Amino acid sequence: MVTVLDTVSKPRPRHPEKAHRPDQEVLRKPDWIRVKAPTSRGYLETREIVKTNKLVTVCEEAGCPNIGECWDKKHATFMIMGEICTRACAFCNVATGIPGPLDPNEPANVAKAVREMGLNHVVITSVDRDDLNDGGAQHFADVIQAIRAATPQTTIEILTPDFLRKDGALELVVAAKPDVFNHNLETVPSKYLTVRPGARYFHSIRLLQRVKEIDPSIFTKSGIMVGLGEERNEVLQLMDDLRSADVDFITIGQYLQPTKKHHPVKKFVTPEEFKSYETIAYTKGFLMASSSPLTRSSHHAGEDFERLRAAREARLSLAKTA
């Protein structure tokens, strides 16, 4: 099927690859998912810093429901390597297409923004860049090094793509020594073909495992969305897969459908069900688990890092006395 797009009289569509898909019903959100519109002074100041430094945030691009809360506290997740992704995941609101060249000034601009915002902890993520030989690994490393030079006290968390078929890319990123390496599985393996078709579930598991093999001191983290049609037992098996890769921290949040062209929400998981997942995650051995309707990978990342570090120290102390 060929989709003809008019880009002369109309601007380029955000998701051209989804234009031919039938509209999906967008379900009304339950009361426990409602959030206030962002209008605070802190939010506006953060937005101005982002704009002045010509930066992209996943908060805006992915339509995160927590943007008002996070930006009010001067927390933001910077999205490097542009705003155009080479993948076309069925759940994601980030634009798909052919990205432009990397901005050589971006590492310095990100570091400047981190300093201006006075961040104790920063999260750096990116679009997928399958067009680059290293998937953008060296650019990740450059950003980490620029932040270290500008604000040595800032702890750094990265949320990376999978670097599929990019030999040596992971090693480049790990060598830059981020404090937290996050790579999201996004969903259970049975949903990959329809939800995350460009990725491979067990490649992502192996990626996380390799981080620990290369540098055991780096915290590892992964997140999923629920409400995509997965079964409960599949979520529990996914937890086991992550623990087999020695992943420290799991996040579980509700999938929210960005547009009628995206994958539909199959279920709004209740707060009680989320709490149950969190309890089970701790029994399976995760150092930390965050599970709630509005949980996102970077939500409360700074506070969570302190708790994560304390949990590791407590576990090590317990092991010494045993």
From Swiss-Prot:
It is an enzyme of class 2 (transferase). Its cofactor is [4Fe-4S] cluster. Binds 2 [4Fe-4S] clusters per subunit. One cluster is coordinated with 3 cysteines and an exchangeable S-adenosyl-L-methionine. It is found in: Cytoplasm. Residues 1-24 are annotated as: Disordered. [4Fe-4S] cluster 1 binds at C59, C64, C70, S298. Keywords: 4Fe-4S, Cytoplasm, Iron, Iron-sulfur, Metal-binding, S-adenosyl-L-methionine, Transferase. Disulfide bonds: none annotated. One of its GO terms (molecular function) is lipoate synthase activity. One of its GO terms (cellular component) is cytoplasm. InterPro entries: Aldolase_TIM, Elp3/MiaA/NifB-like_rSAM, Lipoyl_synth, rSAM. It comes from the Bacteria. Residues 14-24 have a biased composition (Basic and acidic residues). [4Fe-4S] cluster 2 binds at C85, C89, C92. Residues 71-287 form the Radical SAM core domain. Pfam families: Radical_SAM. Its EC number is 2.8.1.8. Pathway: Protein modification; protein lipoylation via endogenous pathway; protein N(6)-(lipoyl)lysine from octanoyl-[acyl-carrier-protein]: step 2/2. Belongs to the radical SAM superfamily. Lipoyl synthase family. This is Lipoyl synthase. It comes from Chelativorans sp. (strain BNC1). The gene is lipA.
